Amino acid sequence: MAATLLYNRNNVSQLPFDTAAMDPQVLQKEMDDAFQADPALGWCLNRGTAPNVKHVRQCRSWDCGLACIQMVARLRNDALTFKEISKLCGNITSIWTVHLSSVLLQRNIAHAIVTTCAGVNQDLESLSFYQDHIEQEKNDVLRLFNTSINNGIRIIESGYSGVNFKHLLLTRRVVLIMLVDNRGLRCTDCGCMKRNWFSCGFTGHYVLVQGYDEEREAFVYHDPADRVQKCWMTLLQFDQCRLVKGTDEDVVVVPY
């Protein structure tokens, strides 16, 4: 993988994918290590109560990540507005996962980043979704990664299967802000694809995953582009929409 990486990588954990894939608990152990260091956080077991996520719709084509941040803020009774989030992002319209981390950091919201590239993946230049602006944004993205790391945000640089995230959601009180290919989102409740897979190339989109429903055997998520309050996707669909070139398998893990 061609990538522009960080200079300061003291807080970046690197795990081989095979290790993560074989042990469903490996991600949970990483999160335990990341969050138990903060006794004020109250990092605790999932007692079977799903979080009361208030659905937020995005306002424009590019602000799905901001809508996910607002849903997280509402979980914490933080009345953060779109305007305030946009200002914390620097009033830009090209949002990377590390911009979302920056907002959470500025609001003192504990979180960790899971990604296959803690930096700028130059392979993304081949995708039309990125190619017009990746060079101009590279320095800003690297600066924000370093800021997050220097402020103690844990970054785990590894690939994980959906089984790892299923186990984490069932055993720990967390929500996930997840970068997906918008073409691959499929809600099992309505039974149809949200977007046409063949209509265009990769289209990055953020969704908020609030838990795993064992009765339905599906992840529960909020799509900011949809009026529907909750959607569901199977383990297979979960991986199909995120394990694609363009996402770097980015997930922001936020305890609540």
Report the location of each language-model feature.
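Predominantly the structural core of cysteine protease catalytic domains
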Residues: 100-203, 252-255
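Surface-exposed loop/turn and secondary-structure junction residues enriched for glycine/proline
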Residues: 56-59, 88, 158, 188, ...
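Noncatalytic regulatory segments and standalone regulatory/sensor domains
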Residues: 2-41, 170-171, 181-256
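Helix N-cap and loop-to-helix transition residues
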Residues: 63, 81-82, 96, 161, ...
